[in-house]
Amino acid sequence: MSDAGYETPPEEGLDVYDEREWHGGQVFTEDRYPNILFAKDGEIYDLDGQKAIAIGGAYSIDKAWCVKGRSWWPDEQPSTEIKSRVEQALGKRGWNIDIVLSHTTPLKYEPTEVFIRGVDQSKVDKSTEIWLDSIEDRLTYRKWYCGHYHTEKKIDRLQIMFNDYAALEL
């Protein structure tokens, strides 16, 4: 799982999470749910010989109806430190990775056909999508999986997922 607006990243100080190593990278777990792993942004995991990076975060258009600190957190988008960690991890690999696991998409792949009518898109902070665009432009990758838009769609090597799930193409 990568973080989104409805979860606060475990590294932001919630003491219910433990950090541990999993497939070559760090993950967060909770004692009550030991089989649910929370990927740490910028960590690279070895999945049957394929390298995958986790990149969480996105802007919540419905945060006005959410409760701050309960169903929405202000740190929903990657911080400067997280962005730096992601870019450093990719830089160490020569900007080459097999799989990207992100919450939202690079801006160029946004599924505008499913945008909610009545939401003024000029007021939506797309800084994460713009940053992911810059990542995607520099990156050599095989497959990119993401969610956020509550739809199913494949565009080139990118797959937006919602109700569907798929075994990673390893």
Predicted feature descriptions by range:
Residues 11-29, 34, 47-127:
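Active-site-proximal loop/helix segment associated with metal-binding centers of metalloenzymes
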Residues 1, 40-41, 55, 102-103, ...:
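Short His-Asn-centered micro-motif
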Residues 1-23, 107-170:
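Conserved beta-sheet core of the metallophosphoesterase superfamily
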Residues 41, 57, 69, 165, ...:
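Active-site donor-binding loop signature of nucleotide-sugar glycosyltransferases
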Residues 41-48, 154-156:
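Short acidic-hydrophobic surface loop/beta-edge motif
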Residues 35-37, 158:
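Short, conserved active-site loop motifs that form the nucleotide-linked donor/cofactor pocket
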